[in-house]
């Protein structure tokens, strides 16, 4: 059992029965040239979450907590994004969803 001091009360959990979910921490949302950037959304607040998230991941791994990553994605042709008049198409088509994005290290993701 691990106890984290927190407000309004300490949080106690069993690391053997706990996973850390990391949701949507992906280059397409946070990187320059990614989907949000192409939509004109300021990604600086998303980028500001990267370092704290990395610290949480490091701490979780040190405690033996399993990490599960969930990410949003579509096929390049958006065939799995719903019907052409669906919200996914209206939002993701102008954002060029499905196009490759360069990660900060230069790799394509």
Located regions from the model:
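Short glycine-enriched, charge-decorated loop/helix-capping segments at active-site entrances
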Residues: 35-45
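A short, charged/proline- and glycine-enriched loop
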Residues: 15-17
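Active-site alpha/beta core segments
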Residues: 10, 19, 50-109
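Short acidic, Gly/Ser-rich segments with clustered Asp/Glu that frequently serve as metal-coordination loops
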Residues: 26-31
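Short, flexible loop segments at the rims of nucleotide/cofactor-binding pockets, characterized by
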Residues: 1, 45-46, 104-105
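Short coil-to-helix leader/linker segments, especially the first N-terminal amphipathic alpha-helix
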Residues: 1-13
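Short amphipathic alpha-helical segments
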Residues: 33-35, 81-82
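Active-site flanking residues adjacent to catalytic metal/cofactor-binding acidic residues
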Residues: 23
């Amino acid at each position: 059992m691990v106890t984290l001091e927190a407000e309004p009360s300490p949080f106690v959990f069993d690391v053997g029965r706990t996973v850390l979910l990391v949701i949507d921490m992906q280059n397409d949302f946070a990187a320059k040239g990614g989907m949000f950037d192409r939509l004109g959304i300021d990604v600086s607040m998303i980028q500001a979450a990267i370092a704290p998230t990395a610290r949480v991941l490091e701490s979780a791994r040190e405690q033996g907590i399993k990490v599960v990553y969930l990410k949003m994605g579509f096929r390049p042709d958006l065939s799995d994004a719903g019907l052409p008049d669906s919200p996914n198409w209206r939002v993701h088509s102008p954002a060029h969803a499905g196009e490759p994005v360069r990660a900060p290290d230069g790799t394509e993701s």
